[in-house]
């Protein structure tokens, strides 16, 4: 299993969050069927996810820089 920042496949951006530490929104995103993670929390204003399957991409996605040129 791996861990990392959840990333939007369409934009390459991290999932933002503002409530640091235990975060219901991040935990929900992390455990969503398309992510398949075990536990999510808010770290440095982005959702960090643990126990992800190898197939789930994490930030950064090569070639996608989240709106930066």
From Swiss-Prot:
The lineage of its organism: Eukaryota, Metazoa, Ecdysozoa, Arthropoda, Chelicerata. This is Neurotoxin Cex7. Expressed by the venom gland. One of its GO terms (cellular component) is extracellular region. Beta toxins bind voltage-independently at site-4 of sodium channels (Nav) and shift the voltage of activation toward more negative potentials thereby affecting sodium channel activation and promoting spontaneous and repetitive firing. Residues 2-67 form the LCN-type CS-alpha/beta domain. Keywords: Amidation, Disulfide bond, Ion channel impairing toxin, Neurotoxin, Secreted, Signal, Toxin, Voltage-gated sodium channel impairing toxin. Has the structural arrangement of an alpha-helix connected to antiparallel beta-sheets by disulfide bonds (CS-alpha/beta). One of its GO terms (biological process) is defense response. It holds the Pfam family Toxin_3. It comes from the Eukaryota. It is found in: Secreted. PROSITE patterns: LCN_CSAB. The modification Cysteine amide is found at residue 66. Belongs to the long (4 C-C) scorpion toxin superfamily. Sodium channel inhibitor family. Beta subfamily. Its main location: secreted. InterPro entries: LCN-type_CS_alpha_beta_dom, Scorpion_toxin-like, Scorpion_toxin-like_sf, Scorpion_toxinL, Scorpion_toxinL/defensin. Residues 67-69 form a propeptide.
């Amino acid at each position: 299993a791996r861990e990392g920042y959840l990333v939007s496949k369409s934009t390459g951006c991290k999932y933002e969050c503002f409530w640091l530490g235990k975060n219901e929104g991040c935990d929900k995103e992390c455990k969503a069927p398309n992510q398949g993670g075990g536990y999510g929390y808010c770290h440095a204003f982005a959702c960090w996810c643990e126990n992800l399957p190898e197939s789930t991409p994490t930030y950064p996605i090569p070639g996608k820089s989240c709106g930066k040129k």
